Swiss-Prot record:
Residues of the signal peptide: none
Species: Cereibacter sphaeroides (strain ATCC 17023 / DSM 158 / JCM 6121 / CCUG 31486 / LMG 2827 / NBRC 12203 / NCIMB 8253 / ATH 2.4.1.)
Keyword Transferase part of the UniProt annotation: yes
GO CC entries: cytoplasm; DNA-directed RNA polymerase complex
Gene3D superfamilies membership: 5' to 3' exonuclease, C-terminal subdomain, DNA-directed RNA polymerase, insert domain, RNA polymerase, RBP11-like subunit
GO terms classed as biological process: DNA-templated transcription
Protein name, UniProt field: DNA-directed RNA polymerase subunit alpha
Length: 338
């Protein structure tokens, strides 16, 4: 009876990603159908995690030659240091290495200094190279040393000042989140003849360091991980079937090999690499365990769930005394039933 609390709730069967004008930055993600009220619950939770908890990169401090503090001005530069610092906050960075790291800008006037003038290093990419940092007049000569780091959320400038900071180092407010905007809408949707379900539509804009659909996937994974501690019981459902005629204590379908399920090459290879041979091996895996399998993503998970559902099975089931000692002999004995 316990499993009915979650097993009998409708689950979304469609996840559609509609790319925006810039697919790497903007997209609409639609999930349906959801139980009534779950659109609001999931939409709000995902939005908060998307904006606050995903890892990103930002400039955390700057040191400009011949500048002692942020209320100074630089000869030949139209903007004062306060404006330069403000503009540096708007530089979008993608880091695939652990920080902090040092980058620099060296420029001479006349001209415009943009984010594209920042020196890049291995594992660090400037995403908005056209972003303006300052304007230089004739004869101006500017050198800046930037510190970049990874983190999440918002970190105030005073937290970015090292204890041994040299004179002239100016800490900067760091906005690490790669997600810039998130909005969601919940509308009614139909499932069969029933219209009393939710459709969740999320519109997501990132800085380009993370695609919108990946951002949603990471946010969902964070929620999944945070909620797991509240589950204080083992799955009670069992795939056992006492069949006197067959002489088995479980459903013979569990003896079918997964390579007979007509899965995509990617899904089949992931199962093979994880040493999952029989359906009995597969159904005892939870969704979380499957998603931890290398190269195994949400698309493969949905494919496998759909195939198992058609057989009256699902992930996370319990099979007593599995695998049987004579599993290969049993598989040959019942292969005609498959």
């Amino acid at each position: 009876m316990i499993h009915k609390n979650w097993a009998e709730l409708i689950k979304p069967t469609q996840l559609v990603v509609k790319p925006g004008a810039d697919p790497a930055r903007v997209a609409t993600v639609i999930a349906e159908p959801l139980e009534r009220g779950f659109g609001l619950t999931l939409g709000n939770a995902l939005r908060r995690v998307l904006l606050s908890s995903l890892q990103g990169a930002a400039i955390t401090s700057v040191q400009i030659d011949n500048v002692l503090h942020e209320f100074s001005s630089v000869a030949g530069v139209r903007e004062d240091v306060t404006d330069i610092v403000l503009n540096l906050k708007g530089v979008s960075i993608k880091m695939e290495v652990e920080g902090p790291k040092r980058l620099s800008i060296s420029a001479k006037g006349p001209g415009v200094v943009t984010a594209g003038d920042i020196s890049e290093s291995n594992g660090i990419e400037i995403l908005n190279k056209d972003h303006v940092i300052c304007h230089l007049d004739e004869g101006a000569d500017v050198f800046m040393e930037l510190t970049v780091n990874t983190g999440k959320g918002y970190v105030a400038a005073d937290k970015n000042r090292p204890e041994d900071a040299p004179i002239g180092l100016i800490p900067i407010d760091a906005i690490y989140s790669p997600v810039k905007k998130v909005s969601y809408e919940v509308t009614p949707t139909r499932e069969g003849q029933v219209l009393d379900y939710d459709k969740l539509t999320m519109r997501i804009e990132t800085d380009g360091g993370l695609t919108p659909d990946d951002a949603v996937a990471y946010a969902a994974r964070i929620l999944q991980d945070q909620l797991s501690i509240f589950v204080n019981f083992e799955e009670p459902e069992s795939a056992t079937r006492h069949d006197v005629e067959d002489g088995l204590e479980f459903n013979p379908l569990l003896l079918k090999k997964v390579d007979e399920l007509e899965l995509s090459v990617r899904s089949a290879n992931c199962l093979k690499n994880d040493n999952i041979v029989y359906i009995g091996d597969l159904i005892q895996k939870t969704e979380a365990e499957m998603l931890r399998t290398p190269n195994f993503g949400r698309k493969s998970l949905n494919e496998i769930k759909e195939v198992l559902s058609g057989m009256g099975l699902h992930l996370g089931m319990d099979v007593e005394d599995w695998p049987p000692e004579n599993i290969e002999d049993l598989a040959k004995r019942f292969e005609d039933q498959f």
